[in-house]
Amino acid sequence: MTLEEKIGQMSQIDARRIGAATALEVRGFLISDSQGIDRHNLIPMSRIDDAVSRKSLVLLK
């Protein structure tokens, strides 16, 4: 299962946990915690929450 498929199967609660303790690289974007690893590639959690509310993560490179 790819990372994209796994994210697609997450519930809202699971998806909101992304970046809480770890960072995931998804198609060149970094989802990180408040420490940040590469701030130029961070996806704001508000954008993640918005995507989760639509039950869809669309990550553009």
UniProtKB/Swiss-Prot annotation:
One example GO MF annotation: hydrolase activity, acting on glycosyl bonds
Active site: D33 (proton donor/acceptor)
Entry binding sites for D-glucose: D33
Tissue specificity comment: Expressed in petioles and leaves, but not in fruits.
Catalytic activity: protodioscin + H2O = 26-deglucoprotodioscin + D-glucose
Enzyme Commission number(s) from the entry: 3.2.1.186
pH dependence as annotated: Optimum pH is 5.0.
Activity regulation, free text: Inhibited by Hg(2+) and D-glucono-1,5-lactone.
Family that this chain belongs to: Belongs to the glycosyl hydrolase 3 family.
Subunit description: Monomer.
Listed name of the protein: Furostanol glycoside 26-O-beta-glucosidase
Organism of derivation: Solanum torvum (Turkey berry)
